[in-house]
Amino acid sequence: MLNNQNTQLPAPRVPVVDRDGQLMERSWYRFFSNFYNYFIALPYGSFYDTTTQTATANTPTAITFNSFANTNHTSIGIPASKIVFDADGLTTITFSIQFTNPSAADDDVYVWLRKNGVDVPYTASAVTVPKKHGSVDGSVVMTVNFHETYGPGDYLELYWITVNGDSKITTIPASVSPARPASPGVVLTVSQII
């Protein structure tokens, strides 16, 4: 954590380099070192999944991840539904999930956070995935943001329920014409803010 005794911006009269012009002045070194350690080295991660995930009707099911874009002090755990933290602090959690529904009836889906295997109160979000229209599956994207405190060794998971058992978490492959990148079924980002 911050040590206010050596992270204050040095006074204007303190030169950036020593008198010989060879080394950074100690006050400035402390400032930049602590700035890096506090702001640049904070834990973060961007995780996603490129498969199709299904669940049995009304059965809480863990959402899994098989890839990451970048991480710092966070990782995909075992099982692959766990996002594990190596440092402590208040973290912002954002997830985006792409649901599709191939059935002839609308389907309600619920998603919530679990921390260390325990459901986090008041984190469930609901969305209705529309029914198939013609030959096109119904689809909807759910995006949610939370703040939660984590410590070293803590982990988070996303759980979901599909009421009818019809909805899926679906990855859409890349396309050449029209050109567009692939769209992962689920994307989760975590960033420590304090």
Protein language model features and the residues they cover:
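Extracellular jelly-roll beta-sandwich "head" domains, especially the C-terminal globular C1q domain
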Residues: 2-5, 18-194
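Long, low-complexity or tandemly repetitive, helically biased scaffold regions used
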Residues: 8-12
